[in-house]
Amino acid sequence: MHRFLSLRFLSSRPGGFVLTLTLAFAALLAVPARAQFGAPPTTHVNDPSALKPPAGARVAIIEFEDLECPDCANANPLLKEAAAKYNIPWVRHDFPLPMHNWSFQAAVNARFFDTKSKTLGNDYRDEVFANQISIETLDQLQQFTQRFASVHGVALPFAIDPMGRLTQEVKDDYALGQRVGIEHTPTIWIVTSATHAPPFVEVLDRGRLFQLIDAALAESRGH
């Protein structure tokens, strides 16, 4: 198993832009992360401190996702629907798996669009998932990102993350996932502020997602 990940995202085409990302990211392979196909095993939670709703919320969806993961793409519309239906936060964490060649850069790109507006960043994530099958390389991701930016009236800079801040945020999310105990994507929890019931429940069967949210809202009522 590789212990070093180096990504370089370059374009010399006229009118293109340059994204360069070289990472000595050994931490990426510290856990045997894998994309989820079929029912995943229950995640053994090592550090539950991140599995709680944001301030002011009784219930939330927490997801660790990889933008190149096919099952994350499958889950995305349902999670979006659930968050809107119940008007609860959907907290999305980046967990780019090391076997995927463009997911890390896609996460950085999404955070760039977040700096314009959170809605735009989430629209980019949605579009990446919807077009995932047509994106195989970093160059294709670059072309897709350029088109997305153009459609939404955003000028992409020569370097999308010149100070490395967005890159560090993705790495921090990955490290958080490692501390929690993430081993597959997507990993999804329903978390609650209730003190008399389990504070988080992993969603292993997405067909029960709404049922789990209903139960969490009932349990947290009055808290």
Per-region residue spans from a language model:
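Periplasmic c-type cytochrome electron-transfer domains
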Residues: 36-44, 138-142
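A short beta-strand-turn-helix
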Residues: 41-59
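C-terminal cap of thioredoxin/glutaredoxin-like
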Residues: 146-223
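Bacterial N-terminal signal peptides
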Residues: 16-28
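N-terminal secretory signal peptides that target proteins for export/translocation
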Residues: 1-13
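Extracellular/periplasmic catalytic domains that process cell-envelope and extracellular macromolecules
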Residues: 53-56, 83-85, 102, 179-184
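Sec/Tat signal peptide C-region and signal peptidase I cleavage site
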Residues: 31-35
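Structural alpha/beta surface segment adjacent to cysteine/selenocysteine redox centers
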Residues: 62, 67, 73-148, 215
